[in-house]
Regions:
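Extracytoplasmic metal-acquisition and chelation regions
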Residues: 22-277
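Bacterial N-terminal signal peptides
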Residues: 4-17
């Protein structure tokens, strides 16, 4: 009886090519933090994601662990990149090691800053599904289910963001304005922003004080130039749109950001908290 069970187990492994109960996950190196979030969600428990690049404390994209992760990748490791340029920037193409890189686009038709756009992410997620399914056809139903869940939850998060509809927000972010548009905010972008981003702050204090008097919240993010972020630090009427941690569920994180911004807008700052040099 025991020999028959062993033979059956071996037969199943040979037929499927993978022993799911042996924690045989699909190892995939990923080129960019935004893609890490997508591959992690769509892959679920079937995929072990290896981030080649991450966000540092300032929100900049940097090589993970000072390049150690990339150096330790084995020849032939499966990898996902947005396009060839993204793969080369991540060190997954054009190096001495040959990785099995799957580029999702040729090339990606938008700026990399468009990736977090709620109207863009679900389409990129579909390409992630295709890549994972080519490597692991057996788990296609799982990946398809996760894609459907991702699309539904992103839509749900944007619906939560509708609490901000018609709220006026001054956008001084580098790449997060699309989140405001998706939520139906009235977005204003100052004409002098390019000059302020270069450190010429003439008129900025008066502009911010005027916004504050009109109860208009100003939003920045990690892509806002550092010189401008430093100037704005400490003001209670500034909201910073954060980068998601790579181990977070992105639709939930997006929903939390919308709620946090709404709380910022409806909470009036205490008198005297916006004094600035």
């Amino acid at each position: 009886m025991g020999n028959k069970v062993i033979a059956l187990v071996i037969g199943v492994i040979l037929l499927t090519g993978r022993a799911g109960w042996c924690d045989d996950k699909l190892n995939i190196a990923v080129s960019h933090p935004w893609l890490v979030l997508l591959v992690s969600f769509i892959g679920g428990t079937e995929v072990n994601v290896i981030p080649v690049r991450v966000w540092n404390a300032n929100g900049d994209v940097v090589v993970a662990d000072r390049g150690r992760v990339l150096r330790e990748l084995e020849e032939g490791t499966k990898a996902v990149a947005l396009d060839e340029d993204d793969a080369k920037e991540a060190g997954l193409m054009g190096t001495r090691k040959n990785f099995a890189v799957r580029c999702l686009y040729s090339p990606f038709p938008l700026s990399i800053n468009a990736l977090p756009d709620p109207s863009v992410m679900p389409f990129v997620a579909q390409r992630v599904l295709t890549a994972l399914s080519e490597w692991d056809a057996m788990n296609y139903p799982n990946y398809q289910r996760r894609l459907a869940e991702f699309q539904a939850r992103m839509s749900s998060s944007v619906l939560v963001g509708q609490v901000l509809k018609d709220s006026t927000v001054c956008d001084m972010s580098g790449a997060s304005g699309v989140m405001l548009q998706a939520a139906g905010c009235r977005v204003i972008r100052p004409e002098e922003l390019e000059r302020w981003e270069k450190g010429n702050f003439a008129g900025l204090r008066e502009y911010l004080d005027n916004n504050r008097n009109q109860e208009i919240t100003t939003m920045i993010d990690d892509d806002t130039p550092a010189v401008l972020k430093r100037y704005l630090s400490g003001r209670s009427d500034i909201y910073k749109w954060e980068r998601p941690p790579l181990d977070r569920d992105y639709p939930t994180f997006l929903q939390e950001q919308y709620i946090s911004l709404w709380q910022k807008i409806v909470t009036k700052p205490l008198p005297g908290m916006n004094r600035k040099r």
